[in-house]
Curated annotation (Swiss-Prot):
<dbReference type="Pfam" id="PF00312">
    <property type="entry name" value="Ribosomal_S15"/>
</dbReference>
<dbReference type="InterPro" id="IPR005290">
    <property type="entry name" value="Ribosomal_uS15_bac-type"/>
</dbReference>
<dbReference type="InterPro" id="IPR009068">
    <property type="entry name" value="uS15_NS1_RNA-bd_sf"/>
</dbReference>
<dbReference type="GO" id="GO:0009507">
    <property type="term" value="C:chloroplast"/>
</dbReference>
<comment type="subunit">
    <text>Part of the 30S ribosomal subunit.</text>
</comment>
<dbReference type="InterPro" id="IPR000589">
    <property type="entry name" value="Ribosomal_uS15"/>
</dbReference>
<dbReference type="GO" id="GO:0006412">
    <property type="term" value="P:translation"/>
</dbReference>
<keyword id="KW-0150">Chloroplast</keyword>
<keyword id="KW-0934">Plastid</keyword>
<comment type="similarity">
    <text>Belongs to the universal ribosomal protein uS15 family.</text>
</comment>
<keyword id="KW-0687">Ribonucleoprotein</keyword>
<dbReference type="GO" id="GO:1990904">
    <property type="term" value="C:ribonucleoprotein complex"/>
</dbReference>
<protein>
    <recommendedName>
        <fullName>Small ribosomal subunit protein uS15c</fullName>
    </recommendedName>
</protein>
<keyword id="KW-0689">Ribosomal protein</keyword>
<dbReference type="GO" id="GO:0005840">
    <property type="term" value="C:ribosome"/>
</dbReference>
<dbReference type="GO" id="GO:0003735">
    <property type="term" value="F:structural constituent of ribosome"/>
</dbReference>
Amino acid sequence: MIKNAFISFQEQKEESRGSVEFQVFSFTNKIRRLTSHLELHRKDYLSQRGLRKILGKRQRLLAYLSKKNRGRYKELINQLNIRELKTR
């Protein structure tokens, strides 16, 4: 059962690599990996810089998605358990 779900997810991933949702999903995975790395290696400043860059990219993509399609934006942030963007 799990293997079949993984295969279907892989097929979806191949089709939708350029979509905003997939990009946000992959950035979120990278952010979580870097965060766990930085908990162990606090003085790794290059990784901190990379984390800030990825956070900025994800923030810009989420802002774009919230302007274009608010429903998909809400659904995505609920799936990924991330907070909403701050409005100015």
